[in-house]
Amino acid sequence: MALLCYNRGCGQRFDPETNSDDACTYHPGVPVFHDALKGWSCCKRRTTDFSDFLSIVGCTKGRHNSEKPPEPVKPEVKTTEKKELCELKPKFQEHIIQAPKPVEAIKRPSPDEPMTNLELKISASLKQALDKLKLSSGNEENKKEEDNDEIKIGTSCKNGGCSKTYQGLESLEEVCVYHSGVPIFHEGMKYWSCCRRKTSDFNTFLAQEGCTKGKHMWTKKDAGKKVVPCRHDWHQTGGEVTISVYAKNSLPELSRVEANSTLLNVHIVFEGEKEFDQNVKLWGVIDVKRSYVTMTATKIEITMRKAEPMQWASLELPAAKKQEKQKDATTD
């Protein structure tokens, strides 16, 4: 019976009886994500593309490992007994002070409000990167490589979550089990947008079996595919919500981010002809006039000022709440 190898960067299935000291090629280090660059602590290679990161060949050989890494242990919280709680109660007379009434929530504005383009703030790093691209664009046109359909033995599949490598013509007929979505890292949790099996352990995330079946993608063909997915994340403070879109070398003159109090439309052109589009029905209400966009060489940050200082349960309004808001609007 074939077992799954849990060594980082391997993910292959192996026969325990034929497992040898050099059967596995893996990474002994840990994944490193810094300034949109992804790599392994044991290797010097870095990339901005998550699929390329997953396909980085291991730098160490050893035996396959079938032992699944343990999930991080959560500390056990013990409650004291009722008897102890009674003893902890103060013996003096308590004076209860009533808290002030909470501020009434702002009524949700209509989604049909006119959209406004948010202010774009362009960083010096992006300006320098775009200037370099303009200088080298003329030379690159003369140095374009001719399309070559030949696939080299050992080429990794570019589909997310697939660890298969090209072994010959028979690999063209194999069924690829992969993740059709994009990886999401939020508040310590890691998961794919297509199946949302969340985990806090990176090795378990890499070992998650795909949720979609199709053909292997041995080469990336961006030609003719303008609209592409981008890894994006969000976080919040008491007064602001920030969305980070990891798109490199975005073009300010072709990009736009527009919003009203409850809707956000994002259109970003980056790396030449790639486009990213996202429309979000916001969970809360924002102050459009005090919201803005910061564009850097490695990402775009959309900073939205909250209309009221409250914690958002999520970035996007759930489908059930959307229907309730629509019903309220029709009855009014």
UniProtKB/Swiss-Prot annotation:
Question: SUPFAM superfamilies of this UniProt entry?
Answer: HSP20-like chaperones (SSF49764)
User: What residue stretches are annotated with the CS domain?
Assistant: 227-316
- Tell me which residues make up the CHORD domain: 5-64, 157-216
Positions binding Zn(2+) 1 in this chain are 5, 10, 24, 64
**Residues engaged in binding Zn(2+) 4:** 179, 194-195, 211
Q: Which residues carry this modification: Phosphothreonine?
A: 47
GO terms classed as biological process: centrosome duplication; chaperone-mediated protein folding; regulation of cellular response to heat; regulation of centrosome duplication
Q: Give an example GO molecular function.
A: Hsp90 protein binding
Keyword check for Repeat, yes or no.
Answer: yes
Q: What is this protein called?
A: Cysteine and histidine-rich domain-containing protein 1
> Does the record's keyword annotation contain Ligase?
no
Where is region (Interaction with PPP5C) located?
Answer: 2-77
List every stretch annotated Interaction with HSP90AA1 and HSP90AB1.
Answer: 65-316
Keyword vocabulary terms for this entry: Acetylation, Chaperone, Metal-binding, Phosphoprotein, Repeat, Stress response, Zinc
Source superkingdom: Eukaryota
Residue numbers of Phosphoserine PTMs: 51
Carrying N-acetylalanine, the residues are: 2
Pfam families referenced in this protein's UniProt entry, alphabetically: CHORD, CS
Q: InterPro entries, per this entry?
A: CHORD_dom, CHRD1, CS_dom, HSP20-like_chaperone
Q: Which residues bind Zn(2+) 2?
A: 27, 42-43, 59
What positions does the entry give for Zn(2+) 3 binding?
157, 162, 176, 216
Role played: Regulates centrosome duplication, probably by inhibiting the kinase activity of ROCK2. Proposed to act as co-chaperone for HSP90. May play a role in the regulation of NOD1 via a HSP90 chaperone complex. In vitro, has intrinsic chaperone activity. This function may be achieved by inhibiting association of ROCK2 with NPM1. Plays a role in ensuring the localization of the tyrosine kinase receptor EGFR to the plasma membrane, and thus ensures the subsequent regulation of EGFR activity and EGF-induced actin cytoskeleton remodeling. Involved in stress response. Prevents tumorigenesis.
Tissue expression pattern: Underexpressed in many breast and lung cancers.
Q: How does it assemble?
A: Interacts with HSP90AA1, ROCK1 and ROCK2. Interacts with HSP90AB1 and PPP5C.
